[in-house]
Each structure stands twice: as C-alpha cells, then as structure tokens.
Amino acid sequence: MDRKISGSISDTKGHNMNIDDKNFCVVPFVQLNTRGKGDARVCCSITGIERGIPKELLLDEITSENYSAETPVYNLMNDSIADLWNSDFMKDFRMKMLNGEYIPACEFCHRMEASGLTSKRIGKNKRFKEKTLPLLQKYYERNGHVDIMPQWWEIRLSTKCNLSCIMCTPGLSSMMYKEYSKWEKQGKSIPMMQGALDIAKDGGQEYLSSSKFFKKQIMDNLEHCLFMEFRGGEVFADKPSVKFIDSIGDTGYAKNI
C-alpha cells in the first residue's frame, strides 16, 4: 500500500533534515527486534505496539479502538523481512527521527536518561550513529526507505523457557505463560496481567524457530549483519534455536558478527 508518510513532506530533495540529538535514535535505521511467535518491534524498549508492527496503521494513528487482536500486523513466519523493514510504519517512524520529533513511544529511554542512566538509545547511537550519519540525508530524501537490511538483529526465536522470573511476561516466557494462566483460573489476575496474557494467547503456539521461511531470509542477509543478540525464553531450551545458531556459526559471515 502506497501512502503519504506522516510527518514528512512530499518532496524532500533539496531540503535538510532537522535531527534533534536529544531525540534521535539510530535503532530504526539499523536494527529489528523479533518476538518468539513471529511478530516484531522497532526495538525491545518501545511501548504502544505490544501486538506487533501494524500493516495498515502509522504510529500516530494507533488507538485502543483500532489496535487489537484483529489488527493486521507483520509476522515474520509469513511476511518478508524486506516488506516489514521498509513498511509504511517503519518509514514513518524513521522520518519522525529525521524531522527531530519527540516520540512518546520511546519514553522508556528518555526516562532512563532523565535518571542519569545509559539508555539503549545512547548505547546504540555510540555504536552506529557515526557510521550511519552519512546515509541519513539519502534516507530522508527517500521518505525513510533504508536500502541496507538490518545490521543488528535482536532475535527471539521462541518463548520456550525453563524459568519463571517474576519480572518476565507470558509473551516472552512459556513458564510465565503457565503462571499467568494459573492465576487467571484462580481469579487472581489483575487487569495489567490479564492484558499481557491475552496478547500472548493471540500470538498462537508456533515458534519462529520452526519457520524455514524466516531462517532462510536471515541466512541470505548475513552479509549485512554485524551484531546478533539471541534472547528467549531461554534460547538453549529450544533445540531448533540452538541448531539455527550453529548453522550461522558455520557460515563464512560468522567471523564478522
């Protein structure tokens, strides 16, 4: 679907970006975050898109009424990485960064920084901003289209876990899914817990680690990859995840990651 990207101008050529160092984050230009059931995030710290990146909504268009279990979201078990990476949502998100906008969905990092802590935004900017800066004007003129596939992958291939860490959620841990389900049956589930459980239920049962389609795309794009973080669940509790990681290690690109 071709649509005008919110926050951009129809013809950016000849215009300059308006990057605000207090708000700019390199993450949407270099990294993608997957979840164990195939949905994705701009990064792990973002708020407001707990069900995944929507196919038909931009960030500013999301409301509690139109973002639900029925909302079409990208799922990398079936949708291509390329389609998600340069979706309207992602291009719009990048243009917000290039136009110097403050993005409320990024408030977790801003709260950390206000407390004197090093946020993910600061950490990733230190690693990637200098390298990415020369490319940003081109991305701006292309309304947020990035022609380099993700260089940093934050991958969750499954939610299979052997621990019940209380700070975790049912969408990330199979053990916490069981705990939340037990509390639901006992009538002890508070609204915030129930909301997290409902989202986890909507994700289905199949793990991303079972998707040959997704894994082939990762293997085909390793030449661009500099960093890979594998998270869970517990990564080593899921045999297909371990096998996939081993297969990456056997490639000629592993020495660069």
Where are these regions (language model features)?
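Accessory C-terminal segments flanking Radical SAM cores
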Residues: 3-133, 140
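Extracellular/periplasmic envelope-modification machinery, especially enzymes
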Residues: 128-136, 186-192
